[in-house]
Amino acid sequence: MKEKINIGYKIPNIEKLVDKISKVIGLIVPVYVMPLKLKRLDENGYAVFSAGIGTVFINTDILVKDKITPFVIKLFIHELWHVKQMSEGRLVFNENHTIATWEGVKYTNKDTFRPWEIEARKMESKYYKQVKI
């Protein structure tokens, strides 16, 4: 998290976590953390990448608590890994986020097999011990 955006409350623990994960996974683009306003089902976060900047939208309850738990660590590893995938051009979404292109192969929202999600889940376990605060 290179720059600060005022979201109405302080998240110093999460800021430290994002910085640490970014270093551990080799993520070099700026990342903003923003409240997730439109939550669907059990969605706790999602990532976007545009104009060389990653934005991770996180469930507001998690941000307000600013508490680092194993779940929160894995959530941020997962979402920051998606930022890395997008910054490297391996994962690209169309403007409406209805079609994803993963390493040259197109997938729609109807596809249940999403290799970028499988990879991000693996990274949660791979990097958890290195990131644990």
Task: For each feature predicted by the language model, list its residue ranges.
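Auxiliary, metal-adjacent structural segments of Zn-dependent hydrolase domains
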Residues: 1-52
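Generic recognition of long tandem-repeat/solenoid scaffolds
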Residues: 3-4, 56-58, 65, 100-102
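Active-site scaffold of zinc-dependent metalloenzymes
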Residues: 36-70, 86-87
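Post-HEXXH active-site segment of zinc metalloproteases
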Residues: 70, 74, 86-118
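Short active-site segment of divalent metal-dependent hydrolases/proteases
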Residues: 77-85
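A generic secondary-structure boundary signal that marks alpha-helix termini
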Residues: 85-86, 129
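Short, conserved alpha-helix that lines the donor NDP-sugar binding/gating region
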Residues: 121
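Short helix/loop segments within enzyme catalytic domains
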Residues: 124-133
